[in-house]
Amino acid sequence: MENTPLSHTALHDVSLVINEGEFTAIAGETGAGKSTLMQLVGGLIQPTSGIVSVDGVPLGKRTPKNDMKDRSARFRVGMVFQYPEHQLFEETVYEDIAFGPRNQGLPEAEVERRVQESMELVHLPQVYRERSPFALSGGERRRTAIAGVLALAPRYLVLDEPAAGLDPRGREELLSMLSTLHRERSMSIVLVSHSMEDILRSAERLILLANGRVVGAGAPCDIFRNTELLEQASLTAPHLLRLGKQIEEIGFPVGHCNTVQEMADLILRTQR
């Protein structure tokens, strides 16, 4: 709440670039500024100083003069908040996913195409179109909500703790879906997460926040091996890397592994 006794600075001197086509993760302890940074990237709030731009278009206060450019830039960023299934409200899966494209003023034929495509992207069967979203499982409802964002055809997909509350199977399906979107659709993904394991598995670059400042940026494996940075951000390395370090100390070189299965396969190969 700006200009009130409750106001405080959430981010300090943050300067960074989210590269197109890259899978970027943002991590930090509670209160580090992750959610504020996410809202700035999506144009939901304005910085008190500095600028946020999407593909070279500054996201500022909308005026009649800049409305079209600003609107176009905002549509390039799709936002998925924590527990997005809580935002479902239409009577059918189809109508919920179609809500965004219709509000973009698209013809109904294009709305139909986008709904079908986004359902395929999140692995929702087309027979679900006329079902109530509230009759689906928790994981299916979340995928329906994400499909509604994908139907807007964003260039950048920003997700805040997208796997929160999911069971192991739902978590695996969601992370696999994000990896497929990134790999096969060249979609730029920004993942805000408390799970260092998810970040190690999925992200190409990690931005580390502490006390509202960027304290590290680089390949997740490099960041996680930097104990000084992790201590500064009050985080711990993924269990897999800590396990790998212990295994290397007893004579098995495991190198860089993103999953337990990769590590197991590597150890087995060294024994042959």
Put a short name on every predicted segment:
Residues 157-160:
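Catalytic Walker B motif of ABC-type/P-loop ATPase nucleotide-binding domains
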Residues 153:
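Conserved catalytic motifs of ABC-family nucleotide-binding domains
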Residues 132-136, 140:
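Conserved ABC ATPase signature
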Residues 27-29:
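The feature captures the beta-strand-to-loop junction immediately N-terminal to the Walker
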Residues 50-61, 73:
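Conserved ABC transporter NBD signature motif
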Residues 149-150:
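ABC ATPase C-loop
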Residues 42:
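Helix-to-loop junction immediately C-terminal to a conserved catalytic motif
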Residues 109-127:
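Conserved ABC ATPase "signature" region
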